[in-house]
């Protein structure tokens, strides 16, 4: 694709999609493998290299200590996970990951000890890459599970999230593009199987939803046109996943919260805020929201009741004096309207339901109070009295 689509390729290169998965080598591995150690729940694990291989000595099947080779990386920032091959074509996800934000090893939650016979233990089904993770980190992923032998022969076209993940199979498009320009037939969508432009907002959002949603899958994604529900079953707004007002509780991957929002109902789509190839925000700070919302009305102290960056004021500090939020943070739209939660340790995920803070309701139903996320020295009564 790069031969013709240079700009799109350059934007994609180095993105979270590009770095979704890779073969472990000196370029792709971020973690410290210079005899680094971490002790969790009385078990000391060691990361090291030998004969060019990345190895970890830790507790494995049945809790027995052993040496395991790491063959693949998974993700990049703010954390990187690592995959270990097991018999039956399985790749298993280590419970120890690299915090690429603070450069340290840590244990991926849950923080409490997990027994070797628990479904969540890292050598068991919950941490199996083939069945739980692979479909959204590689392109044209075919699990190829054999129920008779309880084994996998998993394949992919691209190890990461590549062009065909969104655009669909591209061979016919390449054949069309390689014809002399005057000899190209008039074909639908340049002979690409899946349409990515000229869509309505629902169709556009559902291009992203297969991976950016909490859902079950009824088969492998063939990256071809069709309704989201042809293959996927998005999770409902259940009490184990969302707070009673719809705020995110568990890791739900955006779609379920965004489709609750007024933004979604008014045809806002993912690409209004995210550049589709780099996945970066199209603008920084409040400028992102001011693409649609009038700055004279909303980017003002009269609206958000906070000091702007550069104005005199006192930052919010912790009990031991650490600065938690500098002056001006409260003037950012996302602080009040997209409060988030941390998942998998250091991974902060903003809530995409775009709510108006309601401290009284939050106190009544036990949902997070957007004000108290920053104002850690205050209480719910203060929040309710402060909302005008």
Question: Residues of each region from the PLM?
Answer:
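Local sequence-structure signature of Cys/Sec-based thiol-disulfide redox active-site neighborhoods
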Residues: 2-6
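Primarily the internal scaffold of c-type cytochrome electron-transfer domains
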Residues: 7-75, 81-87, 93-95, 103, ...
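An exposed acidic His-Trp-rich patch
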Residues: 122-125
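Function-dense linear segments that define catalytic or interfacial modules
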Residues: 128-135
């Amino acid at each position: 694709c790069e031969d013709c689509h240079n700009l799109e390729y350059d934007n994609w290169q180095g993105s979270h999609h590009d770095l979704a998965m890779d073969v472990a080598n000196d370029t792709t591995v971020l973690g410290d493998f210079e005899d680094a150690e971490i002790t969790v729940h009385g078990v000391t694990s060691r990361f090291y290299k030998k004969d060019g291989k990345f190895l970890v000595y830790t507790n494995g099947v049945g809790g027995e200590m052993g040496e395991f080779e790491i063959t693949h990386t998974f993700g990049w920032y703010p954390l990187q996970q690592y995959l270990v091959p097991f018999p039956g074509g399985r790749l298993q996800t280590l419970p120890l990951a690299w915090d690429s934000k603070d450069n340290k090893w840590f244990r991926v939650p849950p923080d409490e000890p997990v027994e070797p016979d628990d479904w969540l233990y890292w050598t068991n089904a919950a941490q199996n890459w083939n069945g739980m993770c692979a479909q959204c980190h590689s392109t044209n992923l075919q699990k190829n599970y054999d129920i008779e032998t309880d084994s996998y022969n998993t394949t992919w076209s691209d190890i990461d999230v590549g062009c065909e993940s969104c655009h669909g199979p591209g061979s016919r498009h390449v054949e069309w593009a390689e014809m002399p320009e005057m000899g190209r037939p008039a074909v639908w969508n340049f002979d690409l199987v899946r349409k990515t432009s000229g869509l309505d907002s629902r169709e556009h959002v559902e291009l992203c939803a297969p991976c950016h949603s909490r859902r079950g899958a009824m088969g492998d994604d063939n990256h071809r046109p069709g309704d989201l529900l042809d293959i996927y079953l998005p999770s409902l707004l259940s009490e184990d996943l969302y707070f009673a007002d719809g705020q995110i509780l568990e890791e739900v991957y955006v779609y379920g919260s965004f489709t609750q929002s007024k933004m979604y109902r008014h045809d806002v789509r993912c690409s209004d805020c995210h550049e589709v190839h780099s996945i970066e925000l199209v603008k920084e700070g409040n400028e992102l929201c001011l693409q649609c919302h009038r700055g004279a009305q909303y980017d003002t102290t009269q609206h958000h009741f906070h000091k702007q960056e550069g104005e005199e004021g006192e930052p919010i500090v912790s009990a031991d004096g650490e600065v938690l939020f500098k002056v001006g943070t409260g003037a950012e739209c996302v602080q009040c309207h997209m409060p988030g939660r941390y998942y998998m340790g250091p991974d902060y995920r903003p809530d995409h339901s775009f709510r108006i803070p309601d401290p009284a309701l939050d106190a009544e139903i036990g949902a997070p109070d957007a004000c108290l996320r920053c104002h850690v020295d205050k209480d719910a009564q203060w929040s309710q009295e402060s909302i005008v």
